[in-house]
């Protein structure tokens, strides 16, 4: 049976999975679950993922619903090149270290930056107090500095000389605030150079394809009242 991926490329972990599968020629059928239409909250999607979140994966009768678990499953099943998730114990531990940190580090601040800068005022019609936005962007800059100083340092990629899952997960997170108009790479020259290397390693066409939705997010139409009422509680819980 064909591998099935339930994705919305508005979502940063969905973009990571999409790029990884495409780059490694993993055959899959994509089901687009449009978050801005609340499709992830439907009863039909709940049968795929009871937590009503994307991404989700079905491989025959086997289902996974967490992005890192999906990436590791694909890396193991399809025997992708070693640099993505190295066999070397310490190199693999470095990938694991980044993946463990990013959930409560970079992801939270990137998500909040996008929602506070664009999605609340443009999509949901809710203005964010300037002091809240300023605090969010300050938190983002702190985590960018951690990414640069702790994880990247002076290496070409986060783990060493080659791209890994850590880089892919990190760059798709950073494209959230980039899509929101945040000058993410200003003042972070090592991150700016790393971004260029990651884009080249992935392939510019694939990178742009995966990020087309997020780079146009500022132009999204406002949500209707019903969708806003459905989404607001989950959005507020997500960005706390």
Swiss-Prot record:
Transmembrane segments: none annotated. In liver, highest expression found in central vein limiting plate hepatocytes. Also expressed in interlobular bile duct epithelial cells. In lung, expressed in club cells and ciliated cells of the bronchiolar epithelium and in type II alveolar cells of the lung parenchyma. GO terms for cellular component: cytosol; nucleus. Its EC number is 2.5.1.18. The keyword Transferase applies. It catalyses: RX + glutathione = an S-substituted glutathione + a halide anion + H(+). Glutathione binds at residues 40, 53-54, 66-67. One of its GO terms (biological process) is response to salicylic acid. Keywords: Cytoplasm, Nucleus, Transferase. Gene3D superfamilies: 1.20.1050.10, Glutaredoxin. Residues 88-222 form the GST C-terminal domain. Residues 2-82 form the GST N-terminal domain. Pfam families: GST_C, GST_N. SUPFAM superfamilies: GST C-terminal domain-like, Thioredoxin-like. Changing residue 234 to W: Strongly reduced catalytic activity. It is found in: Cytoplasm; Nucleus. Belongs to the GST superfamily. Theta family. Conjugation of reduced glutathione to a wide number of exogenous and endogenous hydrophobic electrophiles. Also binds steroids, bilirubin, carcinogens and numerous organic anions. Has dichloromethane dehalogenase activity. Homodimer. This is Glutathione S-transferase theta-1. It comes from Mus musculus.
């Amino acid at each position: 049976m064909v591998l099935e991926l339930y994705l919305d490329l508005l979502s940063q972990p969905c973009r990571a999975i999409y790029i990884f599968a495409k780059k490694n020629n993993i055959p899959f059928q994509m089901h687009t679950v449009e978050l801005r239409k609340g499709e992830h909250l439907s009863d039909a999607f709940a049968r795929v993922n009871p937590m009503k979140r994307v991404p989700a994966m079905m491989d025959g009768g086997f289902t996974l619903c967490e992005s890192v678990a999906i990436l590791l499953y694909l890396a193991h099943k399809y025997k992708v090149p070693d640099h993505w998730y190295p066999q070397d114990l310490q190199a693999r531990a470095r990938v694991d270290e980044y993946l463990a940190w990013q959930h409560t580090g970079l992801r939270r601040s990137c998500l909040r930056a996008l929602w506070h800068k664009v999605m609340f005022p443009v999509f949901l019609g809710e203005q964010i107090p300037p002091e809240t936005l300023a605090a969010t962007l300050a938190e983002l800059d702190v985590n960018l500095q951690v990414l640069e100083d702790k994880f990247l340092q002076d290496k070409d990629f986060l783990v060493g000389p080659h791209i890994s899952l850590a880089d892919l997960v990190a760059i798709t997170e950073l494209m959230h605030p980039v899509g929101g108009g945040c000058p993410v790479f200003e003042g972070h020259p090592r991150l700016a150079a790393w971004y260029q290397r990651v884009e080249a390693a992935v392939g510019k066409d694939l990178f742009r394809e995966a990020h087309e939705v997020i780079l146009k997010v500022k132009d999204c139409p406002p949500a209707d009242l019903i969708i806003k009422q459905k989404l607001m509680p989950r959005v507020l819980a997500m960005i706390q």
